[in-house]
């Protein structure tokens, strides 16, 4: 029977009963207790991560992929031209799982060959990479790199794998082939509609990163009474193509690096996240949950993560200021 455009409640009853068996408002854990208060990993819905250049939004997306692979045994497809080609992305991931050891053999404290191969085998179980830089244009000659085309390619890849991806990272939005010569709002709307449609259709968790437009700087006083200028976080409407993102977004996160002067002011008021940050070369990021949808999946607000530069991973601290353990696979 063909699908109906208009349906009655009773015509949907059979599928509604099936959905009750697995119905959950919240998704799965992110791997960070503080983050779980505000967000969750719910399949069938996209997460959008915004931020200024260099703020660490790609790092957050990649860490979510690793945490969910460790905790939930997920399989991810990563599309990240901004990170690099397939080899650079793989080395980036290996570093994140290497627990601080160097991947280059010439360095002291480098991974052994067996450790290196064990990490690659674990990543093989959980990660696939679509290489825009040296793959797409050669394999799909003349095919625009749009979200619709991307998801159609992904569906064909799944047939070859004889399996399905749990999550897909697309990093960032501006790497798509967007026709911005005419109706820009319409073009962006069509791309986001495709993201939502295929995410729901295939029950993925998709993560789409996006840059934010620069805001006007604000003048404030530091702890010594000296003036400094700083840039506040962008609102969701101030992301690149923000009107469409704000309308179409489900879970929208903004990764923000607070200015050093602001961190000192907050530390002086007893904020333990900023104490930790200042003691670790200003490694804090505020994650602002600017929109949450569907109801129950999370809530608006903010939490803090800290970037461990040696391990190339985000961590959180507890209420006593103690560093919580980073998620690593058992190799």
What are these regions (language model features)?
Residues 2-100, 246:
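The Walker A/P-loop phosphate-binding site
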């Amino acid at each position: 029977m063909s699908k109906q455009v208009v349906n009655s409640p009773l015509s949907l009853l059979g599928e509604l009963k099936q959905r009750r068996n697995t119905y959950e408002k919240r998704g799965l854990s992110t791997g960070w207790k503080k983050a779980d208060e505000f967000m969750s990993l719910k399949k069938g819905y996209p997460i959008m991560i915004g931020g200024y250049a260099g703020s660490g939004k790609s790092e957050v997306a990649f860490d979510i992929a690793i945490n969910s692979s460790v905790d939930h045994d997920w399989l991810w497809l990563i599309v990240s031209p901004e990170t690099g080609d397939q080899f650079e992305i793989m080395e980036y991931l290996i570093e994140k799982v290497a627990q601080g050891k160097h991947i280059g053999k010439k360095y002291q404290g480098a991974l052994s060959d067996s450790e290196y191969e064990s990490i690659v085998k674990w990543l093989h179980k959980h990660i696939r990479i679509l290489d825009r830089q040296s793959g797409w244009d050669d394999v799909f000659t003349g095919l625009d790199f749009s979200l619709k085309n991307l998801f159609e390619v992904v569906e064909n890849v799944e047939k070859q794998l004889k399996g399905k991806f749990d999550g897909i990272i697309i990093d960032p939005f501006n790497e798509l082939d967007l026709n911005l010569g005419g109706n820009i709002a319409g073009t962006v709307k069509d791309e986001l509609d495709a993201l939502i449609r295929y995410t729901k259709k295939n029950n993925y968790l998709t993560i789409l990163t996006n840059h934010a437009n620069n805001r006007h700087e604000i003048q404030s006083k530091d702890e010594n009474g000296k003036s400094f200028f700083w840039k506040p976080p962008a609102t969701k409407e101030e992301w690149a193509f923000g009107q469409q993102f704000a309308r179409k977004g489900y879970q929208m996160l903004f990764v923000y690096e607070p200015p050093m002067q602001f961190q000192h002011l907050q530390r002086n008021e007893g904020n333990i996240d900023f104490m930790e940050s200042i003691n670790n070369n200003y490694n804090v990021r505020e994650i602002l949950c600017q929109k949450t949808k569907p109801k129950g999946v999370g809530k608006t607000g903010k939490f803090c993560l800290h970037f461990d530069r040696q391990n190339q991973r985000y961590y959180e601290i507890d209420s006593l200021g103690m560093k919580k353990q980073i998620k690593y696979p058992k190799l």
